[in-house]
Amino acid sequence: MKTLVVALGGNALLQRGEALTAENQYRNIASAVPALARLARSYRLAIVHGNGPQVGLLALQNLAWKEVEPYPLDVLVAESQGMIGYMLAQSLSAQPQMPPVTTVLTRIEVSPDDPAFLQPEKFIGPVYQPEEQEALEAAYGWQMKRDGKYLRRVVASPQPRKILDSEAIELLLKEGHVVICSGGGGVPVTDDGAGSEAVIDKDLAAALLAEQINADGLVILTDADAVYENWGTPQQRAIRHATPDELAPFAKADGSMGPNVTAVSGYVRSRGKPAWIGALSRIEETLAGEAGTCISL
């Protein structure tokens, strides 16, 4: 049986602008898990998820209790792995004919000298109105940036260098478990074992995981159903197949597609195995080449 790493897009957990409630997240997860369950019957499956809204919510709750010094961001990332991993595992385990589902708290090494620490760009937390920027920055010391028509907090997002718990993940996959891992991009730690105040991009973490465990494929699930040429124009066209070199211009795109393309291209170049970008609702068609975008050499 082949091994597949799947990175869930943010809409699998929470729709943009939705309240960060457990009920909303369970409802979205319930829509996502049937397709993942079908995959789990055909592949050894490792599932990576994001945590941007959730870790931002934990940070807000963390700041609300003034009697205790706020917990560092790496600890909050670990908390979000447990929260989201539990919700996914509960929902997946309830599917018929499911193999065992296990969540692995995953640490990923980053460099303390990564330039990302000087220029925070990773969005976390809920969306705010632009007119709230000054008050939020003054109250919490946050850095804020525009995310479409909204405003969100940004934190450092260093490059992942090594997944420290990959052996445990491999062992569980070989034993037939569906493994939820590298949640929120993994808990960032430096080579001396210290936690780092950052959030790693989950697609880059998924690509690194696929490389380290020698997976047979990598799937990045997004809000868009493929990579498009001339996006947003009457001439837009879905790209069904491309090489990493052909997709290179898209790696510089604004929004989430840039990191998506960077992640899959790095994996394909490193391992020579295929990767896909597509929508969760069409994941089986994407793997069959009937939807989404396949990236290969």
Curated annotation (Swiss-Prot):
Which cysteines in this chain are paired by disulphide bridges?
A: none
Q: Which range is the signal sequence, renumbered to this chain? A: none
Subcellular location as annotated: Cytoplasm
Induction info:
Cotranscribed with allF, allG and allH genes, which encode the oxamate carbamoyltransferase. Expressed under allantoin degradation conditions.
Record InterPro entries: AceGlu_kinase-like_sf, Asp/Glu/Uridylate_kinase, Carb_kinase
**Chief subcellular location:** cytoplasm
Q: How does activity depend on temperature?
A: Optimum temperature is 28 degrees Celsius. Activity is twice as high at 28 degrees Celsius than at 37 degrees Celsius.
Q: Which GO terms describe its cellular component?
A: cytosol
Q: What is its EC number?
A: 2.7.2.2
According to its UniProt entry, the protein's GO biological process terms are: arginine deiminase pathway
- For whether the record's keyword set contains Nucleotide-binding, the answer is yes
Its catalytic activity?
Answer: hydrogencarbonate + NH4(+) + ATP = carbamoyl phosphate + ADP + H2O + H(+); carbamate + ATP = carbamoyl phosphate + ADP; hydrogencarbonate + NH4(+) = carbamate + H2O + H(+)
**Keywords assigned:** ATP-binding, Cytoplasm, Kinase, Nucleotide-binding, Transferase
Judging by the UniProt lineage, the source's domain of life is Bacteria
GO terms assigned for molecular function: ATP binding; carbamate kinase activity
Annotated pathway: Nitrogen metabolism; (S)-allantoin degradation
The record ties this protein, via Pfam families, to: AA_kinase
Following inactivation of the gene, the phenotype reported is:
Deletion of the gene does not affect allantoin degradation and causes only a slight increase in metabolic flow into the glyoxylate pathway, probably because carbamoyl phosphate is used to de novo synthesize pyrimidine and arginine.
Describe the family membership recorded for this protein in Swiss-Prot or TrEMBL: Belongs to the carbamate kinase family.
Q: PANTHER family under this entry? A: CARBAMATE KINASE, CARBAMATE KINASE-RELATED
Q: What does this protein do?
A: Kinase involved in the anaerobic nitrogen utilization via the assimilation of allantoin. Catalyzes the transfer of a phosphate group from carbamoyl phosphate to ADP to produce ATP and leave carbamate, which spontaneously hydrolyzes to ammonia and hydrogencarbonate.
> Can you say what this protein is called?
Carbamate kinase
Species per Swiss-Prot/TrEMBL record: Escherichia coli (strain K12)
- What is the primary gene name for this protein? allK
